[in-house]
Amino acid sequence: MRLPREIGPIHFVGIGGIGMSGIAEVLCNLGYTVQGSDASDNANVARLREKGITVSVGHKAENVAGADVVVVSTAIKRDNPELMAARAQRIPVVRRAEMLAELMRLKSCVAIAGTHGKTTTTSMVAALLDAGGLDPTVINGGIINAYGTNARLGGGEWMVVEADESDGTFLKLPADVAIVTNVDPEHLDHFKTFEAVQDAFRAFVENVPFYGFAVMCIDHPVVQALVGKIEDRRIITYGVNPQADVRLVDLTPMGGGSSFKVVFRDRKSGATHEISDIVLPMPGRHNASNATAAIAVARELGLSDEAIRKAIGGFGGVKRRFTRTGEWNGVTVIDDYGHHPVEIAAVLKAARESSNGKVVAVVQPHRYTRLQSLFEEFCTCFNDADAVVVADVYPAGEAPIEGIDRDHFVLGLRAHGHRDVLPLPKAADLAGIVKDLAKPGDLVVCLGAGNITQWAYALPNELKALG
Protein backbone atom coordinates (compact mmCIF):
# COMPACT_ATOMS: atom_id res chain seq x y z
CA MET A 1 0.00 0.00 0.00
CA ARG A 2 1.30 3.45 -0.91
CA LEU A 3 0.53 6.90 0.48
CA PRO A 4 -3.21 7.29 -0.29
CA ARG A 5 -4.34 10.23 -2.40
CA GLU A 6 -7.43 10.94 -0.29
CA ILE A 7 -5.55 11.62 2.96
CA GLY A 8 -6.67 14.85 4.65
CA PRO A 9 -4.55 17.81 5.79
CA ILE A 10 -0.89 16.98 6.53
CA HIS A 11 0.42 19.21 9.33
CA PHE A 12 4.17 19.85 9.68
CA VAL A 13 5.51 20.97 13.07
CA GLY A 14 8.65 22.96 12.26
CA ILE A 15 7.75 23.34 8.58
CA GLY A 16 10.38 26.06 8.03
CA GLY A 17 13.30 23.69 8.55
CA ILE A 18 15.28 22.88 5.42
CA GLY A 19 14.39 19.17 5.49
CA MET A 20 10.75 19.62 6.44
CA SER A 21 10.08 22.39 3.91
CA GLY A 22 11.27 20.25 0.99
CA ILE A 23 8.95 17.36 1.86
CA ALA A 24 6.05 19.77 2.41
CA GLU A 25 6.65 21.41 -0.98
CA VAL A 26 6.69 18.10 -2.87
CA LEU A 27 3.53 16.88 -1.11
CA CYS A 28 1.82 20.16 -2.00
CA ASN A 29 2.90 19.78 -5.63
CA LEU A 30 1.46 16.25 -5.61
CA GLY A 31 -1.93 17.73 -4.69
CA TYR A 32 -2.06 17.00 -0.96
CA THR A 33 -3.39 19.60 1.48
CA VAL A 34 -0.38 20.76 3.48
CA GLN A 35 -0.23 23.11 6.45
CA GLY A 36 2.26 23.73 9.22
CA SER A 37 3.80 25.86 11.90
CA ASP A 38 7.21 27.15 12.84
CA ALA A 39 8.74 29.08 15.71
CA SER A 40 9.52 32.01 13.40
CA ASP A 41 9.23 33.32 9.87
CA ASN A 42 12.06 32.57 7.44
CA ALA A 43 12.71 32.35 3.70
CA ASN A 44 11.45 28.75 3.56
CA VAL A 45 8.18 29.74 5.25
CA ALA A 46 7.74 32.63 2.80
CA ARG A 47 8.29 30.30 -0.16
CA LEU A 48 5.76 27.76 1.15
CA ARG A 49 3.17 30.49 1.70
CA GLU A 50 3.63 31.59 -1.91
CA LYS A 51 2.62 28.06 -2.90
CA GLY A 52 -0.62 28.41 -0.92
CA ILE A 53 0.48 26.50 2.18
CA THR A 54 -0.91 27.90 5.45
CA VAL A 55 1.89 28.40 7.98
CA SER A 56 1.29 29.57 11.55
CA VAL A 57 4.07 31.26 13.50
CA GLY A 58 4.30 29.80 16.99
CA HIS A 59 3.32 26.35 18.23
CA LYS A 60 -0.24 26.07 19.58
CA ALA A 61 -2.47 23.05 20.17
CA GLU A 62 -5.24 24.44 17.97
CA ASN A 63 -2.92 24.45 14.93
CA VAL A 64 -3.38 20.69 14.48
CA ALA A 65 -7.19 20.82 14.47
CA GLY A 66 -8.52 18.91 11.47
CA ALA A 67 -5.19 17.36 10.52
CA ASP A 68 -5.17 13.70 9.41
CA VAL A 69 -1.46 13.26 10.14
CA VAL A 70 1.22 15.30 11.93
CA VAL A 71 4.85 15.29 10.76
CA VAL A 72 7.61 16.22 13.23
CA SER A 73 11.37 16.54 12.98
CA THR A 74 13.73 15.26 15.66
CA ALA A 75 14.20 18.87 16.79
CA ILE A 76 10.61 18.87 18.12
CA LYS A 77 10.50 18.02 21.84
CA ARG A 78 7.89 15.73 23.42
CA ASP A 79 6.32 18.65 25.30
CA ASN A 80 5.61 20.63 22.11
CA PRO A 81 1.92 21.67 22.41
CA GLU A 82 1.08 20.58 18.86
CA LEU A 83 2.68 17.16 19.31
CA MET A 84 0.91 16.71 22.65
CA ALA A 85 -2.44 17.75 21.10
CA ALA A 86 -1.97 15.35 18.18
CA ARG A 87 -1.32 12.45 20.53
CA ALA A 88 -4.24 13.40 22.77
CA GLN A 89 -6.52 13.38 19.70
CA ARG A 90 -5.02 10.11 18.40
CA ILE A 91 -3.83 11.80 15.20
CA PRO A 92 -1.03 9.69 13.66
CA VAL A 93 2.41 11.26 14.23
CA VAL A 94 5.29 10.45 11.89
CA ARG A 95 8.92 11.51 11.85
CA ARG A 96 10.30 13.53 8.96
CA ALA A 97 12.25 10.52 7.63
CA GLU A 98 9.12 8.34 7.64
CA MET A 99 7.23 10.83 5.46
CA LEU A 100 10.24 11.14 3.17
CA ALA A 101 10.29 7.34 2.92
CA GLU A 102 6.61 7.35 1.87
CA LEU A 103 7.44 9.76 -0.96
CA MET A 104 10.43 7.65 -1.99
CA ARG A 105 8.20 4.59 -2.40
CA LEU A 106 6.45 6.40 -5.26
CA LYS A 107 9.67 6.48 -7.34
CA SER A 108 13.03 4.83 -7.94
CA CYS A 109 15.45 6.62 -5.63
CA VAL A 110 19.03 7.82 -5.33
CA ALA A 111 19.87 8.70 -1.70
CA ILE A 112 23.05 10.59 -0.85
CA ALA A 113 24.62 10.11 2.59
CA GLY A 114 27.90 11.11 4.22
CA THR A 115 29.20 13.36 6.97
CA HIS A 116 30.08 16.07 4.44
CA GLY A 117 29.19 16.85 0.84
CA LYS A 118 25.63 15.47 0.85
CA THR A 119 23.85 18.63 -0.25
CA THR A 120 26.24 19.49 -3.07
CA THR A 121 26.34 15.89 -4.32
CA THR A 122 22.53 15.66 -4.21
CA SER A 123 22.34 18.84 -6.29
CA MET A 124 24.85 17.47 -8.79
CA VAL A 125 22.96 14.18 -9.20
CA ALA A 126 19.78 16.20 -9.76
CA ALA A 127 21.50 18.40 -12.37
CA LEU A 128 22.84 15.36 -14.21
CA LEU A 129 19.50 13.54 -14.26
CA ASP A 130 17.88 16.77 -15.46
CA ALA A 131 20.41 17.02 -18.29
CA GLY A 132 19.74 13.41 -19.23
CA GLY A 133 16.02 14.11 -19.64
CA LEU A 134 15.06 12.02 -16.60
CA ASP A 135 13.13 14.92 -14.98
CA PRO A 136 13.76 13.85 -11.35
CA THR A 137 11.89 14.74 -8.21
CA VAL A 138 14.39 16.27 -5.77
CA ILE A 139 14.39 16.80 -2.00
CA ASN A 140 17.62 18.40 -0.81
CA GLY A 141 19.11 19.79 2.39
CA GLY A 142 20.03 23.11 0.79
CA ILE A 143 18.72 25.62 -1.73
CA ILE A 144 19.69 24.54 -5.26
CA ASN A 145 20.51 27.75 -7.13
CA ALA A 146 19.12 26.43 -10.43
CA TYR A 147 15.71 25.83 -8.80
CA GLY A 148 15.63 28.62 -6.21
CA THR A 149 14.33 25.99 -3.79
CA ASN A 150 15.43 22.78 -2.08
CA ALA A 151 12.72 20.64 -3.66
CA ARG A 152 10.94 20.05 -6.94
CA LEU A 153 8.41 17.58 -8.29
CA GLY A 154 9.54 16.00 -11.54
CA GLY A 155 7.58 13.93 -14.01
CA GLY A 156 10.17 11.18 -14.33
CA GLU A 157 10.52 7.89 -12.47
CA TRP A 158 13.57 8.93 -10.41
CA MET A 159 13.80 10.77 -7.11
CA VAL A 160 17.02 12.22 -5.66
CA VAL A 161 17.14 12.80 -1.90
CA GLU A 162 19.64 13.90 0.69
CA ALA A 163 19.81 11.27 3.45
CA ASP A 164 20.46 12.96 6.79
CA GLU A 165 22.27 10.61 9.17
CA SER A 166 22.21 12.94 12.19
CA ASP A 167 19.50 11.05 14.12
CA GLY A 168 19.85 7.62 12.53
CA THR A 169 16.51 7.86 10.71
CA PHE A 170 18.20 7.65 7.29
CA LEU A 171 18.00 3.89 7.81
CA LYS A 172 14.24 4.18 7.12
CA LEU A 173 14.84 5.44 3.56
CA PRO A 174 14.19 2.88 0.77
CA ALA A 175 16.99 3.81 -1.65
CA ASP A 176 17.66 1.91 -4.88
CA VAL A 177 20.99 3.68 -5.30
CA ALA A 178 23.06 4.88 -2.33
CA ILE A 179 26.02 7.28 -2.32
CA VAL A 180 28.40 7.50 0.66
CA THR A 181 30.80 10.46 0.38
CA ASN A 182 32.67 10.04 3.69
CA VAL A 183 32.18 9.00 7.31
CA ASP A 184 33.68 11.12 10.11
CA PRO A 185 33.01 11.43 13.86
CA GLU A 186 29.87 13.60 13.99
CA HIS A 187 26.45 13.51 15.69
CA LEU A 188 27.94 11.63 18.63
CA ASP A 189 25.21 13.17 20.81
CA HIS A 190 22.89 10.67 19.08
CA PHE A 191 25.19 7.77 18.18
CA LYS A 192 27.40 7.95 21.33
CA THR A 193 30.35 6.20 19.61
CA PHE A 194 32.05 6.47 16.22
CA GLU A 195 31.65 2.70 15.84
CA ALA A 196 27.88 3.18 16.00
CA VAL A 197 28.12 5.82 13.25
CA GLN A 198 30.01 3.37 11.04
CA ASP A 199 27.50 0.60 11.77
CA ALA A 200 24.67 2.91 10.69
CA PHE A 201 26.33 3.68 7.36
CA ARG A 202 26.92 -0.03 6.77
CA ALA A 203 23.22 -0.72 7.40
CA PHE A 204 22.30 2.16 5.05
CA VAL A 205 24.26 0.54 2.21
CA GLU A 206 23.01 -2.97 3.00
CA ASN A 207 19.42 -1.68 2.78
CA VAL A 208 19.89 -1.21 -0.98
CA PRO A 209 18.02 -3.96 -2.91
CA PHE A 210 19.93 -6.62 -4.85
CA TYR A 211 19.14 -4.86 -8.14
CA GLY A 212 20.50 -1.54 -6.87
CA PHE A 213 24.04 -0.41 -6.11
CA ALA A 214 26.07 1.81 -3.81
CA VAL A 215 28.66 4.41 -4.87
CA MET A 216 31.34 4.84 -2.19
CA CYS A 217 34.41 7.09 -1.88
CA ILE A 218 37.53 5.02 -1.15
CA ASP A 219 39.70 8.11 -0.73
CA HIS A 220 38.24 8.10 2.76
CA PRO A 221 39.85 5.33 4.87
CA VAL A 222 36.73 4.69 6.95
CA VAL A 223 34.63 4.27 3.80
CA GLN A 224 37.26 1.98 2.26
CA ALA A 225 37.13 -0.15 5.41
CA LEU A 226 33.34 -0.17 5.13
CA VAL A 227 33.54 -1.39 1.53
CA GLY A 228 35.53 -4.37 2.78
CA LYS A 229 32.74 -5.36 5.18
CA ILE A 230 29.86 -5.30 2.67
CA GLU A 231 29.63 -8.65 0.90
CA ASP A 232 26.18 -8.99 -0.64
CA ARG A 233 25.58 -5.73 -2.48
CA ARG A 234 27.01 -4.23 -5.67
CA ILE A 235 29.53 -1.53 -4.83
CA ILE A 236 31.04 1.03 -7.23
CA THR A 237 34.04 2.80 -5.70
CA TYR A 238 35.18 6.29 -6.69
CA GLY A 239 37.93 8.80 -5.91
CA VAL A 240 41.50 9.70 -6.84
CA ASN A 241 42.57 6.37 -5.33
CA PRO A 242 44.26 4.27 -8.06
CA GLN A 243 42.02 1.33 -7.06
CA ALA A 244 38.75 3.21 -7.65
CA ASP A 245 36.25 1.88 -10.20
CA VAL A 246 35.43 5.47 -11.17
CA ARG A 247 38.63 7.47 -10.87
CA LEU A 248 39.11 11.23 -10.74
CA VAL A 249 42.33 12.13 -12.61
CA ASP A 250 44.20 15.18 -13.91
CA LEU A 251 42.43 17.59 -11.55
CA THR A 252 43.54 21.12 -12.42
CA PRO A 253 42.39 24.25 -10.53
CA MET A 254 41.30 27.03 -12.89
CA GLY A 255 39.97 30.35 -11.61
CA GLY A 256 36.89 29.70 -9.54
CA GLY A 257 36.61 26.10 -10.66
CA SER A 258 38.52 23.07 -11.92
CA SER A 259 38.91 20.72 -14.86
CA PHE A 260 39.41 16.96 -14.69
CA LYS A 261 38.88 13.57 -16.30
CA VAL A 262 36.93 10.59 -15.02
CA VAL A 263 38.09 7.07 -15.90
CA PHE A 264 35.69 4.11 -15.55
CA ARG A 265 37.08 0.59 -15.12
CA ASP A 266 34.80 -2.45 -15.14
CA ARG A 267 35.99 -5.10 -12.68
CA LYS A 268 34.29 -7.95 -14.56
CA SER A 269 35.27 -7.23 -18.15
CA GLY A 270 38.33 -5.07 -17.59
CA ALA A 271 36.92 -2.53 -20.06
CA THR A 272 37.78 1.14 -19.54
CA HIS A 273 36.06 4.35 -20.56
CA GLU A 274 37.20 7.95 -20.14
CA ILE A 275 35.28 11.21 -20.02
CA SER A 276 37.75 14.05 -20.54
CA ASP A 277 37.47 17.84 -20.55
CA ILE A 278 35.03 18.02 -17.64
CA VAL A 279 34.87 21.58 -16.28
CA LEU A 280 33.27 22.23 -12.89
CA PRO A 281 32.53 25.89 -12.04
CA MET A 282 33.24 25.32 -8.32
CA PRO A 283 36.69 25.27 -6.69
CA GLY A 284 38.13 22.53 -4.52
CA ARG A 285 39.09 18.88 -4.75
CA HIS A 286 36.17 18.02 -2.47
CA ASN A 287 33.71 19.40 -5.04
CA ALA A 288 35.41 17.52 -7.88
CA SER A 289 35.11 14.37 -5.75
CA ASN A 290 31.39 15.04 -5.20
CA ALA A 291 30.98 15.51 -8.95
CA THR A 292 32.72 12.17 -9.57
CA ALA A 293 30.17 10.40 -7.35
CA ALA A 294 27.31 12.02 -9.25
CA ILE A 295 28.92 11.14 -12.60
CA ALA A 296 29.25 7.50 -11.49
CA VAL A 297 25.49 7.35 -10.89
CA ALA A 298 24.68 9.21 -14.10
CA ARG A 299 26.67 6.82 -16.28
CA GLU A 300 25.02 3.80 -14.60
CA LEU A 301 21.64 5.35 -15.46
CA GLY A 302 22.62 5.67 -19.11
CA LEU A 303 23.62 9.33 -19.54
CA SER A 304 25.88 10.19 -22.46
CA ASP A 305 29.34 11.70 -22.01
CA GLU A 306 28.14 14.94 -23.58
CA ALA A 307 25.13 15.20 -21.25
CA ILE A 308 27.46 14.66 -18.29
CA ARG A 309 29.90 17.36 -19.45
CA LYS A 310 27.06 19.80 -20.08
CA ALA A 311 25.43 19.25 -16.68
CA ILE A 312 28.66 19.60 -14.71
CA GLY A 313 29.80 22.59 -16.77
CA GLY A 314 26.51 24.37 -16.15
CA PHE A 315 26.18 23.43 -12.49
CA GLY A 316 24.85 26.48 -10.64
CA GLY A 317 25.85 25.41 -7.15
CA VAL A 318 24.02 25.43 -3.84
CA LYS A 319 23.24 28.32 -1.54
CA ARG A 320 25.69 28.60 1.37
CA ARG A 321 28.27 26.40 -0.40
CA PHE A 322 31.13 28.77 -1.34
CA THR A 323 28.56 31.41 -2.27
CA ARG A 324 29.88 34.82 -3.33
CA THR A 325 27.89 37.51 -1.48
CA GLY A 326 29.61 40.60 -2.84
CA GLU A 327 32.80 42.58 -3.27
CA TRP A 328 34.48 45.63 -1.77
CA ASN A 329 37.69 47.28 -2.96
CA GLY A 330 38.71 44.09 -4.80
CA VAL A 331 37.98 41.93 -1.74
CA THR A 332 35.50 39.08 -2.37
CA VAL A 333 33.22 37.88 0.45
CA ILE A 334 32.21 34.20 0.52
CA ASP A 335 29.46 32.54 2.59
CA ASP A 336 29.88 28.85 3.42
CA TYR A 337 27.99 26.41 5.63
CA GLY A 338 31.17 24.58 6.67
CA HIS A 339 31.06 23.95 10.43
CA HIS A 340 32.97 20.68 10.91
CA PRO A 341 36.82 20.71 10.83
CA VAL A 342 36.95 18.50 7.72
CA GLU A 343 34.56 20.84 5.88
CA ILE A 344 36.40 23.96 7.03
CA ALA A 345 39.77 22.60 5.88
CA ALA A 346 38.33 21.67 2.46
CA VAL A 347 36.69 25.08 1.97
CA LEU A 348 39.85 26.98 2.95
CA LYS A 349 41.96 24.81 0.65
CA ALA A 350 39.55 25.61 -2.19
CA ALA A 351 39.77 29.31 -1.29
CA ARG A 352 43.56 29.13 -1.34
CA GLU A 353 43.50 27.49 -4.80
CA SER A 354 41.09 30.05 -6.25
CA SER A 355 42.79 33.21 -4.95
CA ASN A 356 46.13 34.85 -5.57
CA GLY A 357 45.64 36.99 -2.49
CA LYS A 358 45.25 36.23 1.20
CA VAL A 359 42.46 34.14 2.69
CA VAL A 360 40.74 35.63 5.74
CA ALA A 361 38.50 33.16 7.60
CA VAL A 362 35.66 34.37 9.81
CA VAL A 363 34.32 31.47 11.86
CA GLN A 364 31.25 31.18 14.07
CA PRO A 365 31.64 27.86 15.91
CA HIS A 366 28.36 25.90 15.85
CA ARG A 367 27.35 24.17 19.11
CA TYR A 368 29.41 23.98 22.29
CA THR A 369 29.39 20.18 22.22
CA ARG A 370 30.90 20.06 18.71
CA LEU A 371 33.65 22.52 19.62
CA GLN A 372 34.40 20.52 22.77
CA SER A 373 34.45 17.05 21.20
CA LEU A 374 36.47 18.09 18.13
CA PHE A 375 38.60 20.81 19.73
CA GLU A 376 41.99 19.49 18.54
CA GLU A 377 40.65 19.16 15.00
CA PHE A 378 39.21 22.69 15.08
CA CYS A 379 42.59 24.06 16.20
CA THR A 380 44.38 22.54 13.20
CA CYS A 381 41.91 23.01 10.32
CA PHE A 382 42.62 26.71 9.62
CA ASN A 383 46.15 26.32 8.22
CA ASP A 384 45.10 27.61 4.77
CA ALA A 385 43.75 30.86 6.24
CA ASP A 386 46.23 33.73 6.56
CA ALA A 387 44.09 35.22 9.31
CA VAL A 388 41.25 33.84 11.43
CA VAL A 389 38.53 35.93 13.09
CA VAL A 390 36.66 33.95 15.76
CA ALA A 391 33.09 34.85 16.77
CA ASP A 392 31.14 33.66 19.80
CA VAL A 393 29.78 30.12 19.68
CA TYR A 394 26.35 29.80 18.05
CA PRO A 395 24.54 27.64 20.63
CA ALA A 396 21.81 26.12 18.40
CA GLY A 397 19.71 25.60 21.53
CA GLU A 398 22.54 24.21 23.68
CA ALA A 399 23.48 25.43 27.14
CA PRO A 400 27.01 26.89 27.43
CA ILE A 401 29.83 24.60 28.53
CA GLU A 402 32.26 26.18 30.97
CA GLY A 403 35.64 26.83 29.35
CA ILE A 404 34.39 26.09 25.82
CA ASP A 405 33.99 29.49 24.22
CA ARG A 406 35.40 31.97 21.73
CA ASP A 407 38.44 32.96 23.80
CA HIS A 408 39.38 29.35 24.56
CA PHE A 409 39.22 28.64 20.82
CA VAL A 410 41.39 31.69 20.01
CA LEU A 411 44.02 30.51 22.51
CA GLY A 412 43.84 26.99 21.10
CA LEU A 413 44.46 28.16 17.53
CA ARG A 414 47.44 30.25 18.67
CA ALA A 415 48.82 27.40 20.78
CA HIS A 416 48.66 25.11 17.75
CA GLY A 417 50.82 27.52 15.77
CA HIS A 418 48.47 29.82 13.88
CA ARG A 419 50.13 33.19 13.38
CA ASP A 420 47.14 35.53 13.10
CA VAL A 421 44.01 34.90 15.18
CA LEU A 422 41.61 37.59 16.40
CA PRO A 423 38.51 37.40 18.61
CA LEU A 424 35.38 39.14 17.27
CA PRO A 425 33.90 41.18 20.17
CA LYS A 426 30.50 41.47 18.45
CA ALA A 427 29.03 41.12 14.97
CA ALA A 428 28.93 44.90 14.46
CA ASP A 429 32.74 45.00 14.71
CA LEU A 430 33.33 42.61 11.80
CA ALA A 431 33.48 45.18 8.99
CA GLY A 432 36.09 47.26 10.81
CA ILE A 433 38.29 44.22 11.46
CA VAL A 434 38.01 42.99 7.86
CA LYS A 435 38.78 46.49 6.54
CA ASP A 436 42.09 46.42 8.40
CA LEU A 437 42.94 42.84 7.39
CA ALA A 438 41.90 42.52 3.74
CA LYS A 439 43.51 44.00 0.64
CA PRO A 440 42.47 43.92 -3.05
CA GLY A 441 42.56 40.34 -4.36
CA ASP A 442 41.87 38.78 -0.97
CA LEU A 443 39.04 36.37 -0.09
CA VAL A 444 37.01 36.70 3.11
CA VAL A 445 35.36 33.36 3.89
CA CYS A 446 32.54 33.34 6.46
CA LEU A 447 32.13 29.85 7.93
CA GLY A 448 29.38 28.34 10.07
CA ALA A 449 25.90 26.85 10.23
CA GLY A 450 24.45 29.64 12.40
CA ASN A 451 23.44 33.22 11.63
CA ILE A 452 26.88 34.13 10.25
CA THR A 453 25.27 33.85 6.80
CA GLN A 454 23.46 37.12 7.57
CA TRP A 455 26.80 38.76 8.38
CA ALA A 456 28.27 37.48 5.12
CA TYR A 457 25.50 39.10 3.08
CA ALA A 458 25.66 42.37 5.04
CA LEU A 459 29.47 42.64 5.05
CA PRO A 460 30.10 44.04 1.51
CA ASN A 461 27.76 47.00 2.09
CA GLU A 462 29.08 47.55 5.62
CA LEU A 463 32.61 47.74 4.20
CA LYS A 464 31.47 50.21 1.53
CA ALA A 465 29.90 52.36 4.25
CA LEU A 466 33.28 52.56 5.98
CA GLY A 467 34.79 53.98 2.79
Swiss-Prot record:
Write out the GO cellular component annotations.
cytoplasm
HAMAP family, per this entry?
MurC
Q: Which UniProt keywords apply?
A: ATP-binding, Cell cycle, Cell division, Cell shape, Cell wall biogenesis/degradation, Cytoplasm, Ligase, Nucleotide-binding, Peptidoglycan synthesis
Recorded catalytic activity of this chain's protein: UDP-N-acetyl-alpha-D-muramate + L-alanine + ATP = UDP-N-acetyl-alpha-D-muramoyl-L-alanine + ADP + phosphate + H(+)
Q: Which family does it belong to?
A: Belongs to the MurCDEF family.
The UniProt GO MF terms for this protein read: ATP binding; UDP-N-acetylmuramate-L-alanine ligase activity
| Gene3D superfamilies with a match to the protein in the record | Mur ligase, C-terminal domain (3.90.190.20), Mur-like, catalytic domain (3.40.1190.10), NAD(P)-binding Rossmann-like Domain (3.40.50.720)
The record's subcellular locations are:
Cytoplasm
Pathway in which this enzyme or protein is active:
Cell wall biogenesis; peptidoglycan biosynthesis
Q: Which InterPro entries match?
A: Mur-like_cat_sf, Mur_ligase_C, Mur_ligase_C_dom_sf, Mur_ligase_cen, Mur_ligase_N, MurCDEF_pg_biosynth, UDP-N-AcMur_Ala_ligase_MurC
Q: Which organism is it from?
A: Bradyrhizobium sp. (strain ORS 278)
The name of this protein is: UDP-N-acetylmuramate--L-alanine ligase
Query: Its Enzyme Commission number?
Result: 6.3.2.8
